[in-house]
């Protein structure tokens, strides 16, 4: 807000709250735009025609609000203005995180309350006829362009005409002013005089003290920049109705491109308030225009309206329902609302929780049904594939047996061929030996012949030679004969071998073809089986994985439901507590505001009294003393006012602090409510983090290798440090030797002291030099000591880190021990699993035996039932043949009787009786045959039922066998998983061993570091001692000469020492960095080991669950076997009962045959006896003619044929 140029008195430092000032002169044209904060107009005319009180009240977020004193245009206007800071301060206030506490009298969106009061004092029967707008002195928002200065109003707020919309008229009626309010209340109170005192002292009764619902459903406040960007909202004429008041929003006009610098916030506040009230109601209500009232004194208490479904929303709805058409007071209605809410709250909580649980349970049941359906389909498919698989397995076994038989034949033939080859080789060897002998003998013969030719000696020698020749010839002939025999044998063997080879080749070719054919068939069958088994196993594995996932999801959802229920209960309790705290703070704030308003009223009264007294004193009294006294009193009152304002500001700051704390608590509640959503995201992130952890494990292994390399580098560096330390020790020894030399030189100089005064002068000069050098040495020593101190500190830090590393290693050792224990427990569990597997195998063998026994018994039962059926069929055939014979006999007898009846004419009555008896007997026999036939059908039906039961039992046994095979596959799978677990455990042990090796390496490095540190400390102590000795010697050698060569050597040595110390510091920094890296790697390894341990525990849990499932399946198999035993026993009992029934039927049939035979014999005897008593032929012809006899015979034939 801009300040007026004709400001006379200084303005007070008022930024917030209420400010009251007197106005005793009309507002000039230059002052029509704004009212200054805390400023007063100069008191030129004390007795002006108009006066008033401008009350400035802090609004929401620093927004102003003004009520006119007079509604006439062009006249003077004074009134209440909600005053904020200047433009910059207001923007800052708007941008701050300031939330107001909940208004207990607020109306919720969508439920408008009746108009109880307004900021403007309207005439009776007038509702919202216009809207409060800014004064045209700053920027007129009533029209599209600025107004003339002559047309401007002197009031702060002016009732501007509404923007013309299609089909609407312009209403320029102003709001009624504060004077009209005073008149109205004066008239209501009856007789109270109009004036300022009446306004101050008049108190409304409780029934008329009504708060406005202007901003009860305000939205979260916007920033000043956003409000300045928005266009000014214009309102269409509102409709008046009985109970509810609202407003509807029309399209806004564009804002002027260059607003004036003194832009007032009262219009912004008004537009924003109306817009925030309009937005939620425009969605829920009809297009009918609802009225809206806003009051300036209660805008601070407004807060965001509760969303639909909340407690406040329910409270507002119940309040609106109870308030309609009721004449009760507001407190009684609110008490009823609170009672209804207390009774409804547990029902709402139960309904919300039950709906969520029912929805989750429905989803779970649907998923379980889908999984069960998939499992049933898989079982059916596997049952269909099972018979083909059994046949293929049988073919496979036959083919394998044939292959093994052929392989045995091949091996046998190969052995025979090898033996024949060996014999051939032996024969060839013998032939070669014979050939060699023949060649040798021929050579000998040739030699002898040569000797004979050469030696023509005496005859005895010739005879000897001839004898030798003969013997050799005989030997040669024998050898040739043996050779021929051997060759013949060889030829025979070769022929046999060629024949055998040809036969073998043919057999091998045929066998190879058969084997190839069988192998191809076997491969095809095995491929088909493999594919089917792989598909079945994959589907089964997928189903099991889905089932496990669903079970895990169900458990997780149950846990989450329990956790969410607990969390909701906790948060509800917290929310209730926070609500109570908010209400308490709200009540405190309301009390503080009431006290502040009372104090402001008292201050206003005091200030008015003081001003009146001051004016009276100025007008009447001329005494300066009284003026000074009044001035002092004014100053005191001003000081008191400032103190009160400071107290008020401190109270406001405390209220703001409380509001901020409440906002923080609300934010914490919202954050805690959002945690439930974040849990699902965290579950997804956990899977990603697991993959990242695996990648990190691989990277950790790589980093481990790098760490080992770095450890090797560290060892080399430590060796270098140790060498440098040894060199420093050697240099220190040299330094000691030089010091000893210096001491000797000093002794020599002491001997030369007696030489003379000239020598003393030279020695003094040298002593000065020595002192300077001594100072330099001391400085160098101090520097070296400081460097040693820094080295010691670095060593301490390294030791501390190494100790931490040792602790981490100790922790790793403990974790390794726990892992070893876990591994031992897993080994025990595996042993238990193996035992369980052995037991399952034993149970499987027992089940196989029982199934085989049951199959054999069922086969026996089937054979017995077939035999019984065959016997019954044979008996029935016999019965049929007997019946046919009896019918033929009866027909023959009937024919005989007919011929005899033709011959005889007597005994018709007897014959008719006999015929009737025969008919009855035939009917009885037919009835008995029918019963026998029915019994036979019943027996056939029972046999069919038994056969069906036997087939069902076979099927169930096949299903049981399939289940057993599935159990075997599961056991094999579990064994494979156990092997995998063993491999993982071995890998874990390898990693643990590597960790141990790393720990040992780190321990050795720590020991080396400690030894190096001890050496350095010893060197440091020795150096300190040497320094002390040097100091003492230098102090004693003052005044004696010292050679300069030794000083230069000492300086060079000091420089070398400094360089070495710097190098050591660098190496120490490098060592520190490597130690840090090692510590990080150790931490990563520990994390990796923990993850692996958790993974092992998870796998252990999975194995335990699978073992339980297998045990459950075994129990189910045992129950099924017991059920099959019961069915077998039941079938045996039924078969025994059937045998008994068959025996009974056979006995009955025999008795029937005996009865029929007896009846037939009796009837034949009676007919023979009664044949003589027949009547004449006419009588026979008349009573029993041939046509009747033929009909009887045909009836009997038909009856027999039907039987």
From Swiss-Prot:
The modification N6-acetyllysine is found at residue 579. The keyword Coiled coil applies. Residues 1161-1203 are annotated as: Tail. The keyword Signal does not apply. Residues 54-67 are annotated as: Interaction with TJP1/ZO1. Its main location: other. Residues 246-267 have a biased composition (Low complexity). Disulfide bonds: none annotated. It comes from the Eukaryota. Residues 166-191 have a biased composition (Polar residues). One of its GO terms (molecular function) is microtubule binding. Residues 207-231, 883-903 have a biased composition (Basic and acidic residues). One of its GO terms (biological process) is microtubule cytoskeleton organization. Residues 358-1160 form a coiled coil. GO terms for cellular component: bicellular tight junction; myosin complex. Keywords: Acetylation, Cell junction, Coiled coil, Phosphoprotein, Tight junction. A motif (ZIM) lies at residues 48-62. Probably plays a role in the formation and regulation of the tight junction (TJ) paracellular permeability barrier. PANTHER family: CINGULIN (PTHR46349:SF4), CINGULIN-LIKE PROTEIN 1-RELATED (PTHR46349). Belongs to the cingulin family. Deletion of the TJP1/ZO1 interaction motif (ZIM) decreases but does not abolish colocalization with TJP1/ZO1. This is Cingulin. It comes from Papio anubis (Olive baboon).
């Amino acid at each position: 807000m801009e300040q007026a140029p004709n400001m006379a008195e200084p303005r007070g430092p008022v930024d917030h709250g209420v400010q009251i000032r007197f106005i005793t002169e009309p507002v000039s044209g230059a002052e029509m735009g704004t009212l200054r904060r805390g400023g007063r107009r100069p008191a030129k005319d004390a007795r002006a025609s108009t006066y008033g009180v401008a009350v400035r009240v802090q609004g929401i977020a620093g927004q102003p609000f003004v009520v006119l004193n007079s509604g006439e245009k062009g006249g003077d206007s004074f009134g209440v203005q909600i005053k904020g800071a200047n433009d910059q301060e207001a923007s800052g206030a708007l941008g701050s995180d300031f939330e107001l506490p909940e208004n207990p009298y607020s109306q919720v969106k969508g439920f408008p309350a009746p108009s109880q009061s307004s900021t403007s004092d309207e005439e009776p029967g007038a509702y919202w006829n216009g809207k409060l707008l800014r004064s045209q002195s700053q920027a007129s928002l009533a029209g599209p362009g600025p107004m003339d200065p002559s047309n401007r109003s002197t009031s702060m707020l002016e009732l501007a005409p509404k923007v013309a919309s299609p089909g609407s008229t312009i209403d320029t009626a102003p709001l009624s002013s504060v004077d009209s309010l005073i008149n109205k209340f004066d008239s209501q109170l009856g007789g109270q005089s109009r004036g300022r005192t009446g306004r101050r002292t008049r108190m409304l009764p409780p029934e008329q003290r009504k708060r406005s619902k202007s901003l009860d459903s305000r939205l979260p406040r916007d920033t000043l920049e956003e409000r300045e960007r928005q266009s000014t909202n214009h309102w269409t004429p509102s409709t008046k109705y009985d109970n509810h008041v609202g407003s509807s929003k029309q399209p806004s006009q564009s804002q002027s491109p260059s607003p004036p610098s003194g832009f007032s916030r009262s219009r912004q506040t008004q537009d924003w308030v109306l817009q925030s009230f309009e937005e939620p109601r425009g969605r829920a209500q009809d297009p009918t225009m609802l009225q809206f009232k806003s009051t300036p004194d209660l805008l601070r208490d407004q807060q965001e309206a509760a969303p639909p479904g909340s407690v406040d929303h329910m409270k507002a709805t119940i309040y609106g329902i109870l308030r309609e058409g009721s004449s009760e007071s507001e407190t009684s209605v609110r008490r009823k609302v609170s009672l209804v809410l207390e009774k409804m709250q547990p029902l709402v909580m139960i309904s919300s929780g039950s709906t969520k649980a029912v929805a989750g349970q429905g989803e779970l049941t649907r998923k379980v049904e889908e999984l069960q359906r998939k499992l049933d389909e898989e079982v059916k498919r596997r049952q269909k594939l099972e018979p083909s698989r059994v046949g293929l397995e049988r073919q496979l076994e036959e083919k394998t047996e044939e292959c093994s038989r052929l392989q045995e034949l091949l091996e046998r033939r190969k052995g025979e061929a090898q033996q024949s080859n060996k014999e051939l080789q032996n024969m060839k060897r013998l032939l070669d030996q014979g050939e060699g002998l023949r060649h040798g003998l021929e050579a000998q013969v040739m030699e002898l012949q040569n000797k004979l030719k050469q030696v023509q000696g005496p005859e005895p020698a010739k005879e000897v030679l001839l004898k030798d020749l003969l013997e050799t010839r005989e030997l040669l002939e024998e050898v040739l004969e043996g050779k021929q025999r051997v060759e013949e044998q060889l030829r025979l063997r070769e022929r046999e071998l060629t024949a055998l080879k040809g036969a073998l080749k043919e057999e091998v070719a045929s066998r190879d073809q058969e084997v190839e054919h069988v192998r191809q068939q076997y491969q095809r069958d095995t491929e088909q089986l493999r594919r089917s088994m792989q598909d079945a196993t994959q589907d089964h594995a997928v189903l099991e994985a889905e089932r496990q996932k669903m079970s895990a999801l169900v458990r997780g959802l149950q846990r989450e439901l329990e956790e969410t229920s607990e969390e909701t209960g906790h948060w509800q309790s917290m929310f209730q507590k926070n609500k109570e705290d908010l209400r308490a703070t709200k009540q405190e704030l309301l009390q503080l505001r009431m006290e502040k308003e009372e104090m402001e009223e008292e201050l206003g009264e005091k200030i008015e009294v003081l001003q009146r007294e001051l004016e009276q004193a100025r007008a009447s009294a001329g005494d300066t003393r009284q003026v000074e006294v009044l001035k002092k009193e004014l100053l005191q009152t001003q000081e008191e006012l400032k103190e009160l304002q400071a107290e008020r500001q401190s109270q406001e700051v405390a209220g703001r602090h409380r509001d901020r704390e409440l906002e923080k608590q609300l934010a914490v509640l919202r954050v805690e409510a959002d945690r439930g959503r974040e849990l699902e995201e965290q579950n997804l992130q956990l899977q990603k983090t697991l993959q990242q952890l695996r990648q990190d494990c691989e990277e950790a292994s790589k980093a481990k290798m790098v760490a080992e390399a770095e450890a090797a580098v560290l060892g080399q560096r430590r060796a270098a440090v140790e060498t440098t330390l040894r060199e420093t020790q050697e240099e220190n020894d040299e330094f000691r030797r030089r010091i000893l030399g210096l001491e000797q030189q000093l002794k020599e100089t002491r001997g030369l002291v007696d030489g003379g005064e000239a020598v003393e002068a030279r020695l003094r000069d040298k002593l000065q030099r020595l002192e300077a050098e001594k100072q330099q040495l001391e400085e160098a020593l101090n520097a070296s000591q400081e460097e040693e101190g820094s080295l010691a500190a670095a060593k301490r830090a390294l030791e501390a880190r190494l100790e931490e590393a040792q602790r981490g290693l100790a922790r790793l050792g403990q974790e390794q021990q726990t892992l070893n224990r876990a591994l031992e427990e897993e080994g025990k569990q595996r042993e238990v699993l193996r035992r369980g597997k052995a037991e399952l195998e034993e149970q499987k063998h027992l089940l196989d035996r029982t199934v085989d026994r049951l199959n054999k018994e069922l086969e026996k039962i089937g054979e017995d039932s077939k035999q019984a059926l065959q016997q019954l069929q044979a008996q029935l055939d016999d019965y049929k043949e007997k019946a046919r014979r009896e019918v033929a006999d009866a027909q023959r007898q009937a024919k005989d009787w007919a011929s005899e009846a033709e011959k005889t004419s007597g005994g018709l009555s007897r014959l008719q009786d006999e015929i009737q008896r025969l008919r009855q007997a035939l009917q009885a026999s037919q009835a008995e045959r029918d019963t026998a036939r029915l019994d036979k059908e019943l027996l056939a039906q029972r046999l069919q039922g038994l056969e069906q039961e036997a087939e069902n039992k076979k099927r169930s046994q096949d299903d049981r066998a399939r289940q057993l095979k599935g159990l075997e596959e599961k056991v094999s799978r579990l064994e494979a998983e156990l092997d995998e677990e063993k491999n993982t455990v071995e890998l874990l042990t390898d990693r643990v061993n590597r960790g141990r090796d790393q720990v040992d390496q780190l321990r050795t490095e720590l020991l080396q570091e400690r030894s190096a540190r001890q050496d350095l400390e010893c060197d440091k102590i020795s150096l300190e001692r040497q320094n002390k000795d040097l100091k003492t010697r230098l102090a004693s050698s003052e005044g004696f000469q010292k050679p300069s060569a030794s000083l230069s050597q000492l300086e060079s040595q000091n420089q070398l020492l400094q360089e070495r110390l710097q190098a050591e510091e660098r190496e120490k920094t490098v060592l520190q960095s490597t130690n840090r890296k090692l510590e990080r790697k150790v931490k990563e390894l520990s994390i990796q080991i923990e993850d692996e341990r958790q993974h092992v525990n998870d796998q252990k849990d999975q194995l335990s669950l699978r073992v339980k499932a297998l045990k459950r399946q075994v129990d189910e198999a045992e129950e099924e076997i017991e059920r099959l035993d019961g069915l077998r026993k039941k079938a045996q009992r039924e078969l025994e009962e059937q045998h008994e029934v068959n025996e009974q039927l056979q006995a009955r049939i025999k008795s029937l045959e005996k009865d029929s035979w007896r009846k037939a014999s009796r009837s034949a005897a009676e007919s023979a006896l009664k044949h003589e008593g027949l009547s004449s032929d006419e009588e026979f012809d008349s009573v029993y003619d041939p046509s009747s006899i033929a009909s009887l015979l045909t009836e009997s034939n038909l009856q027999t044929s039907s039987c």
